[in-house]
């Protein structure tokens, strides 16, 4: 991610922009700890799934007790859940919700997916998984999760955020020229690079 994109990335769940209000409301319920089922965020590249996952975890743990981990599944090996289990047990002793973000969960091997399913059944807790390929996640895991498709917002959804970013750099532009540029953007990465 570029320095500009990092500088203007959302820092709180409330700063996220969604294409669908029903998905936003559903995820707000997760952020407020009103829902507890594990989540699989799926959709196209650059739709913001990893950012949503990170901000959901920080919303659910606002004082940052640190009982959560983020794992990119592209390079995990057999036994990848062992360190998570230690964190999980300690969190449970303190009566804190253990959480784990599994990015690119579809890249877990079949064996690792079965281990994950068994871990979910044995320990519970909040898993938030991201994937561009929902079909590559075993149906037994999908059935235990709330599978939420994240569609990239459209130009009108991005407009207020883009105007705020431009204003922070002393640039004021009306909506029409910005909408022309934003109409060509397919996702957040395109918007931040425009």
Predicted features and spans:
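Walker A/P-loop
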Residues: 29-71
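The conserved phosphate-sensing helix
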Residues: 183-194
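Conserved catalytic/switch belt of AAA+ P-loop NTPases
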Residues: 88-89, 102-143
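Short glycine-/polar-rich loops that comprise or flank the Walker A/P-loop
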Residues: 36-37, 63-68, 97, 123-125, ...
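Pre-Walker A (pre-P-loop) alpha-helix and adjacent loop at the N terminus of AAA/AAA+ ATPase modules
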Residues: 2-44, 86-90
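Conserved AAA+ ATPase "SRH/arginine-finger" region at the nucleotide-binding site
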Residues: 72-74, 146-158
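Short glycine-rich substrate-engagement loop in P-loop NTPases that contacts/grips substrate
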Residues: 16-17, 21-24, 66-98
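Short conserved motifs of the RecA-like P-loop NTPase core
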Residues: 172-185
